[in-house]
Structure formats: C-alpha cells, structure tokens
Swiss-Prot record:
The chain crosses the membrane at residues 3-23, 28-48, 62-82. NDH-1 shuttles electrons from NADH, via FMN and iron-sulfur (Fe-S) centers, to quinones in the respiratory chain. The immediate electron acceptor for the enzyme in this species is believed to be a menaquinone. Couples the redox reaction to proton translocation (for every two electrons transferred, four hydrogen ions are translocated across the cytoplasmic membrane), and thus conserves the redox energy in a proton gradient. The keyword Iron does not apply. Disulfide bonds: none annotated. This is NADH-quinone oxidoreductase subunit K. It is a multi-pass membrane protein. The gene is nuoK.
C-alpha cells in the first residue's frame, strides 16, 4: 500500500476532528475530536518518517502520545469539575466555572 493513502487518511481524520471541534458543544465530544486530531498528526508524522527512511517522525509521534496522555488527565478533570458545578458538559458552561 502506498504511503500516500496514509497521508490522505490522516488529512481526512484531521478534518473530521476539526469539524467536530468547531461544531459540537458537548465538552466530551470536543475532547474526543481533539484527540482524533492528535492521532491524525501522529499518523502523518509516522508516514513522513517512513517515506524519508528515518525514525525522527516516530520519536516525535511517541512524544505527542505522551503529551496527549497528560492532556487526557487534565482535560477530563476539567470536564468533571464543570459537570459537578453545572450538571452539564456543555462548553458554554466553561466560563461559569469560576463561580
């Protein structure tokens, strides 16, 4: 299979994630779309790494996954805090978290 197909898949996944971030109001769905965008970037990094024949893209994808794991912890903690105070997971309620 040609590496270009992986780049096309990466572009489609990134676009779906970006559309989800822009159009959805539920914080959990937005969070999942951001993770989809990160995974699409990882797929592109690994594909470019394979095309060039070096491991730099794979190492960078590993570090992106480490940062994404930390993001999951912080993001879910914020979503739970919003849900506990407002009984809603809407991103519109995020500005009300300080009260």
């Amino acid at each position: 299979m040609s590496p270009m197909y992986y780049l096309y898949l990466s572009a489609v996944l990134f676009t779906l994630g970006a559309v989800g971030v822009l159009l959805r109001r539920n914080a959990i769905i937005v969070f999942m779309c951001v993770e989809l965008m990160l995974n699409a970037a990882n797929l592109a990094l690994v594909t470019f790494s394979r095309i060039n024949g070096n491991l730099d893209g794979q190492v960078m994808a590993f570090f992106v996954m480490v940062v994404a794991a930390a993001e999951v912890v912080v993001g879910l903690a914020i979503i739970v805090a919003i849900f506990r105070t407002r009984r809603s997971a809407s991103v519109d309620d995020a500005n009300l978290l300080k009260y």
